[in-house]
Regions:
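Tandem repeat scaffolds
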Residues: 1-223
Length: 223
């Protein structure tokens, strides 16, 4: 029976030796922590921030790492395939993943596989997406404000109402996007080579009003 006096939200759980398995730490911030000695077998680690954390001595058998955040400084156990675990970070294999409305702000997603990913409504503000292949991804209503998308491929993407304001789109491939009705490109860097092609898109796309940014796609490209 749940003891409400002893209960604490999963996101407030601190990694401490001696906790009984399986742990429920969904949404917790464990960034920069040394997790040696923590029993993580079968642990619920969804959305846990593991950036800079040391899990090299942990047993992650059966742990749920979906949407957990890692970076180049995160240390995983030898032989553990963190890139295919559902966690989000550089080199993650997320083709076709359901990431709708996910909070992905400020993450290093370089070398990620995001082909066909469902990212509608996801917040990617300030994230590093340089060279990422987003071919066929659903980015409708996604927020990419200030994101670095240098050399990213958006071919066959749905970009309706995507917010690219102040993003760096240098060498990005946008011409093959399926649709970009209402997308806002205000203040984007590196769009000069693509601007003419984007402005030749159907008028129904270019003249769609974005109620959030209060711009049409056309005016955002012409600014």
């Amino acid at each position: 029976m749940l003891d409400l006096l002893q209960w604490q939200p999963p996101e407030d759980l601190l990694p401490t030796v001696g906790f009984g398995a399986p742990l429920d730490a969904r949404g917790a911030d464990w960034s920069g922590r040394d997790l040696a000695g923590i029993d993580l077998r079968g642990a619920a680690l969804c959305r846990v921030d593991l950036r800079g954390a040391d899990l090299s001595a942990c047993d992650l058998d059966g742990a749920d790492l979906r949407l957990a955040r890692f970076d180049v400084f995160t240390r995983f156990p030898e032989g553990f395939d963190h890139r295919s675990s559902g966690a989000v970070g550089p080199g993650a294999k997320l083709n076709g993943a359901f990431l709708n409305s996910a909070d992905l702000r400020g993450l290093d997603l370089r070398s990620c596989n995001l082909m066909g990913a469902y990212l509608s409504g996801a917040d990617l503000s300030g994230s590093l997406l340089d060279g990422v292949r987003l071919v066929g991804a659903d980015l409708r209503h996604a927020v990419l404000r200030g994101a670095s998308c240098v050399g990213a491929s958006f071919s066959c993407c749905q970009l309706d109402f995507a917010d690219f304001r102040a993003a760096d789109l240098s060498s990005a491939r946008l011409e093959g996007a399926e649709s970009l009705s209402g997308a806002d490109f205000s203040g984007c860097l590196g769009l000069d080579a693509e601007r003419s092609a984007l402005l030749s898109r159907p008028y129904k796309e270019l003249d769609t009003w974005n109620p959030l940014t209060r711009e049409t796609t056309r005016t955002s490209l012409e600014a």
